[in-house]
């Protein structure tokens, strides 16, 4: 439940469309609903600006479907990250309108399509191999009510591809830059723009990349002062933070 749905609930009571007892029944599950294996946080949108997001890894299809359907019944947008097709099959039996975004490995249910962001969030990937992480950021930012554009495969091995898109970079209010290997691209982008750059190290690379650790350390030591960093492969975290920045 978010602030808008709470206002509607109170308004329905005021207009006589809903009895006080019905309203109490709907509010009973605030702040959370105990399913035994999960305590579903229905209050999170009021506190944090976005409903609880389901991390699909290590959850059974039945668990994901149960949590997803409980959130969907409260009239909010729902997102499950790191989800697979078996989990989606279980979800779509319970939630009509749920969609699976294969590249992002995300299940989405979007009821609220209002735009809350003040500008454009641009998601950049260094290579094609970084796109799944970038797409997780795209899906997250879109579901949080942002205008999102993407720019893929513009890494430093062919920096002219990036420079040819300086106009696109310049239109962004917030940038998310995903890169593996040595993780140089966020620093390059940071030197070209005057807005926040959220760097996402990916686990793409050969042995000494250490599954994204080399990129993470490189990004944390960026000389570009507008670069901040999230965890390895954490496109969701980048999309979430970019959305909060874009609302300021």
Model-derived regions: residue spans:
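Short glycine-rich or small-residue beta-strand-to-loop segments that form or flank ligand, phosphate
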Residues: 53-54, 120-126, 175-177, 230
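Short glycine/serine/threonine-rich phosphate/pyrophosphate-binding segments
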Residues: 62-64, 130-135, 159-160, 179-189, ...
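Glycine-rich phosphate-binding loop
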Residues: 164-202
């Amino acid at each position: 439940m978010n602030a808008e749905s709470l206002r509607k609930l109170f308004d329905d009571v005021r207009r006589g469309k809903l009895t006080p007892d019905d309203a109490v029944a709907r509010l009973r599950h605030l702040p959370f609903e105990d399913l035994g294996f999960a305590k579903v946080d229905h209050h999170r949108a009021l506190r944090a600006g976005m409903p609880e997001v389901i991390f699909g890894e290590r959850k059974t299809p039945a668990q994901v479907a149960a949590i997803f359907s409980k959130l969907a019944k409260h009239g909010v947008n729902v997102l499950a990250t790191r989800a697979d097709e078996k989990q989606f099959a279980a979800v779509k039996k319970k939630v009509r309108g749920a969609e699976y975004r294969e590249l992002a490995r995300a299940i989405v249910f979007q009821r609220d399509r209002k735009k809350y962001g003040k500008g454009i969030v641009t998601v950049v990937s260094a290579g094609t191999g970084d796109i799944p992480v970038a797409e997780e950021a795209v899906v997250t930012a879109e579901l949080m009510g942002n205008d999102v554009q993407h720019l893929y495969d513009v890494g430093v091995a062919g920096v002219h591809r990036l420079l040819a898109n300086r106009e696109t970079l310049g239109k962004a209010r917030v940038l998310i830059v995903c890169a593996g290997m040595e993780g140089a691209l966020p620093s390059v982008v940071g030197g070209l723009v005057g807005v926040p750059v959220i760097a996402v190290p990916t686990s793409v690379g050969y042995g000494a990349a250490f599954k994204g650790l080399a990129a993470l350390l490189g990004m944390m030591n960026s000389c570009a002062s507008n670069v901040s960093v999230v965890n390895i492969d954490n496109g969701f975290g980048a999309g979430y933070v970019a959305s909060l920045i874009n609302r300021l």
